[in-house]
Amino acid sequence: MLEGVIRESITKANAKALKKDGYLIANVYGKGIENVNCAFKLNPFIKYLKEKKHLIFPVKLGDKTFEVVVQEYQKNPVTNELIHVDLLAVTKGVKSKFKVPVKHQGTPVGLKNKGILMLSKKRISVECAPEHLPDHYLVDVAPLDVNESVLVRDLEKHENVKILDHDSIAVIGVIKAK
């Protein structure tokens, strides 16, 4: 479980000092809870995010534990280093909006026909309660030929999960190489 520190002071100088000490500035918020300004050690946070199996994960701040999901993050445009993260605290039974990653498997037929695999949408917007949240959408790209794509309406449907993206948006496809 990730452990963070609660920030008593939210001044710019305090944030700079924390960043200099290797901390990532974060904000935990959600329905029915007060915003918590906090900070996590940067390297353990990144390592934990890469190793986690589910979108929802626990964090401990002071004496409280929250079930959270990464809602938004900011990176330095030059160094690509993570500088801020917003964590949404979720409550069982309460619907929220989430962004679920898209993963693909297989090698498209179109790659042999001089095509290029194009991932158009890396995340799908959904609305559901946390207990129904899928960890990812898996797309089999093996049957795709040149100029074929998988649309949002072609994704597997999960019970009690409403996809918010428009049905006709392409998620992944094979385009012709120039």
Curated annotation (Swiss-Prot):
Tell me the domain of life. Bacteria
Q: What SUPFAM superfamilies would the database entry show?
A: Ribosomal protein L25-like (SSF50715)
**Which biological process annotations from GO are given for this protein?**
translation
Q: Which GO terms describe its molecular function?
A: 5S rRNA binding; structural constituent of ribosome
* Pfam families per the UniProt record, alphabetical: Ribosomal_L25p, Ribosomal_TL5_C
The terms describing its cellular component in GO are: cytosolic large ribosomal subunit
| Keywords, in A-Z order | Ribonucleoprotein, Ribosomal protein, RNA-binding, rRNA-binding
Q: Which InterPro entries match?
A: Rbsml_bL25/Gln-tRNA_synth_N, Ribosomal_bL25/Gln-tRNA_synth, Ribosomal_bL25_b-dom, Ribosomal_bL25_C, Ribosomal_bL25_long, Ribosomal_L25_dom, Ribosomal_uL5_bac-type
HAMAP family assigned: Ribosomal_bL25_CTC
Question: What is annotated about its quaternary structure and interactions?
Answer: Part of the 50S ribosomal subunit; part of the 5S rRNA/L5/L18/L25 subcomplex. Contacts the 5S rRNA. Binds to the 5S rRNA independently of L5 and L18.
Q: What does this protein do?
A: This is one of the proteins that binds to the 5S RNA in the ribosome where it forms part of the central protuberance.
Q: Which PANTHER family match?
A: RIBOSOMAL PROTEIN L25/GLN-TRNA SYNTHETASE, ANTI-CODON-BINDING DOMAIN-CONTAINING PROTEIN (PTHR33284), RIBOSOMAL PROTEIN L25_GLN-TRNA SYNTHETASE, ANTI-CODON-BINDING DOMAIN-CONTAINING PROTEIN (PTHR33284:SF1)
The similarity comment for this entry is:
Belongs to the bacterial ribosomal protein bL25 family. CTC subfamily.
This chain belongs to the protein called Large ribosomal subunit protein bL25
Q: Gene encoding this chain?
A: rplY
